[in-house]
Amino acid sequence: MAILSHEYWKKFIEKDKNGKEELINVFEETQRPHFHDPRAPRFLLTDQQGKFALGIGGYLKTTMEYDFNGIVDDVDFIPALIPQPGSTSVRNQFQMDASTSTIFLKLVGRTKHLGNFIVYTAGNFRGSGKTFELQNAYLSFLGFTMGYDTGLFMDLAAAPPTIDFQGPDGMTFYRATQLRYEANVMKGLKVGVGVEMPSVDGTPAQDVRIGKQRMPDIPAYVQYSWAKASHIRVGGILRSMTYEDQVNNKAKSLTGWGIQASGTARLGGFQLYGQYTYGRGIAQYLNDISNLNVDIVPLADESGRMQVLPMKGWYAGLQYNFSKRVFASATYSQSRLFTEDCYAHFNETQYKKGQYLVANVFWNVSHNLQVGAEYLHGWRENFNDVNREANRINLSAQYNFCLLYTSPSPRDS
């Protein structure tokens, strides 16, 4: 067994005669592209034959937050959680958070029948009472991935960089237990399809119970890449949501669906990001709206019946790379819940629209240390047209127990 720090990888590669170079390359080629995911592991444990390598890494991150002229009732900046009028007189708030600090283990192996395979587990301290919470636990081989991971109905590489852990409202982000298959069918063209564990968040109603689900969620996508860190992607998801009509003692189902277009492109020192999502009954997948429990909602004046509402989310962002160590970005996003069958009439104080504006700058002080500063502004509008706003300043310091990816542009998966 050999233990290697990342600084010695190149020396190790030069002396390699047992296929270990290929394993090290797999670590970097399969690096997760989301801004908040940890980078390549700093330490490796390898076996004598060079068939297996275990990477250990993570980061410690501390954030200071100050809200002014309106607050958000959470450590993440979620416009849906801007307090309702009259619920609080507090207009300023100071918070600190270290719960997004992350630890991961990544095993890479080579076998005769499975080829290169990956076992990845990661977690942070976002559990109840800041306890450890699993974020990823999956096995990948031959294009298949099984386990718990971020969902397939999202585009990690097209997400803009933020200190705020949630990210823009209207962006698709969720995690699910799943089985998926992804393949490169030709140069630049990649496809994926999966089945995911369903989870339905609905508004409580008399004579209705949301319980066991009978069908998996089915996401799929097609992605075309024309250069490093440049791609467009079109995806969709189909879901069946079961609820119990206790008036007629009958199980009923509603169909939810969503479509999405996303992408990112590198133009000189600039990086562009964007996403647009529209659908029905897809609330749990969209930032901001996912806090409202509106996958399915009661149908007005009809006891025991539910309905699905239309909704959308989108964002557009721009990043400029001043150098390999310094970059800045700005993103605007919006999410919207639409009404049908008098839903707004009976829920006037319900969220109708959220907006999110963020601007930030990051400095990679060294391979291990990154600091950042960020301004956020959020708006919440209800169906009765009442508006509330909030502002936040974030400051962060992140020390990486892994190799910091100093190139500030995303990596395509």
Regions picked out by a protein language model, each given a short descriptive name:
Residues 67, 110, 124-128, 153-155, ...:
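Sequence/structural signature of outer-membrane beta-barrel proteins
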Residues 1-68, 407:
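N-terminal periplasmic/intermembrane-space "pro-region" immediately following the signal or transit peptide
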Residues 45-76, 86-200, 214, 219, ...:
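Outer membrane beta-barrel
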Residues 112-114, 143-146, 187-191, 229-232, ...:
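Repeated loop/turn-to-beta-strand initiation elements of outer-membrane beta-barrel proteins
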Residues 227-351:
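Detector for outer-membrane/organellar transmembrane beta-barrel domains
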Residues 134-136, 176-178, 215-221, 231, ...:
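Transmembrane beta-barrel architecture of outer membranes
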Residues 405-412:
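Conserved small/polar residues in nucleotide/adenosyl-binding loops
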